């Protein structure tokens, strides 16, 4: 199992806890609003909106909240903000690369909060391009294992452009090119396999191994960044060995 998959496992466990917070709901709602504004308010003709709604439903966001966000984004209802996507780059403890994806209606506030979180938790901001080249944009679909084997999932998505299927313990993760994401998700649906989320993600092409102490410091930094309402996603190139994961679970 590669380092990013272990990181994904840890992030998944954390996401289950985070899903209980209103902050996580707000970020999912924001994704729906932006997707509707960018590609139209009909999920049938807007795959990004469809997937944003699917993820929100799987995370138990109330249907009324989802529908209001869709309407705001589509211009059917007043109150939508002018959200902008901004990427920040930096280095965390142990030289770990950090890519921070913000969705904000106030660039100055977002920049200030990101900088504060970085400097207070052993990180440093970096110039644009100094970290992003270490990451590649990928399509990622996650699903609960259920009754499916890894081979079942692989057979369903192989011809749709899936590059790999990874067993993450309680879930499977399917990675593809971003352009094949809808095809992979559709292949699962045609095979009658339910999925949790389908979205574009950043994956590290070069990873940095850390010990348990280093991992805790990186998690602390990521937590601080994700406390900002403007931060949608935080990506790192940390590599967690099985030994480090076992120590973290103790």
Curated annotation (Swiss-Prot):
Key word Zinc present: no
Subcellular location: Cytoplasm
Span of the signal peptide: none
Record GO biological process: regulation of DNA-templated transcription
Keyword check for Calcium: no
InterPro entries (UniProt xref): Integrase-like_N, TACO1_YebC-like_2nd/3rd_dom, TACO1_YebC_N, Transcrip_reg_TACO1-like, Transcrip_reg_TACO1-like_dom3, YebC-like
GO MF annotations in UniProt: DNA binding
One Pfam family here: Transcrip_reg
GO cellular component annotations of the record: cytosol
Keywords: Cytoplasm, DNA-binding, Transcription, Transcription regulation
Family: Belongs to the TACO1 family.
Alphabetical list of NCBIfam families matching this protein: PRK00110.1, PRK12378.1, YebC/PmpR family DNA-binding transcriptional regulator
Name of the protein this chain belongs to: Probable transcriptional regulatory protein RHA1_ro06891
């Amino acid at each position: 199992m590669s380092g990013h998959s272990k990181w994904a496992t840890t992030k998944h466990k954390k996401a289950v806890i985070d899903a209980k917070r209103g902050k996580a709901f707000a970020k999912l709602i924001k994704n729906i609003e932006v997707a509707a504004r960018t590609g139209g308010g009909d999920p049938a003709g807007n795959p990004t909106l469809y997937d944003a709604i699917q993820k929100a439903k799987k995370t138990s966001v109330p249907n009324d909240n989802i529908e209001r966000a869709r309407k705001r984004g589509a211009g059917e209802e007043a109150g939508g903000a002018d959200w902008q996507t901004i990427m920040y780059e930096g280095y965390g403890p142990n030289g770990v690369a950090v890519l921070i994806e913000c969705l904000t209606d106030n660039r100055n506030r977002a920049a200030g909060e990101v900088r504060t979180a970085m400097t207070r938790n052993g990180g440093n901001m970096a110039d644009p391009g100094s970290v992003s080249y270490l990451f590649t944009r990928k399509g990622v679909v996650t699903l609960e294992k259920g009754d499916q084997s890894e081979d079942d999932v692989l057979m369903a998505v192989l011809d749709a452009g899936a590059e790999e299927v990874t067993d993450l313990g309680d879930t499977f993760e399917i990675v593809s090119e971003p352009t094949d994401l809808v095809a992979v998700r559709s292949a699962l649906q045609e095979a009658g396999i339910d999925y949790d989320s389908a979205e574009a993600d950043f994956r590290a092409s070069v990873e940095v191994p850390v010990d348990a102490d280093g991992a805790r410091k990186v998690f602390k930094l990521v937590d601080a960044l994700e406390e900002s309402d403007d931060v949608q996603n935080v990506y790192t190139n940390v590599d967690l060995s099985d030994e480090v994961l076992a120590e973290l679970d103790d």
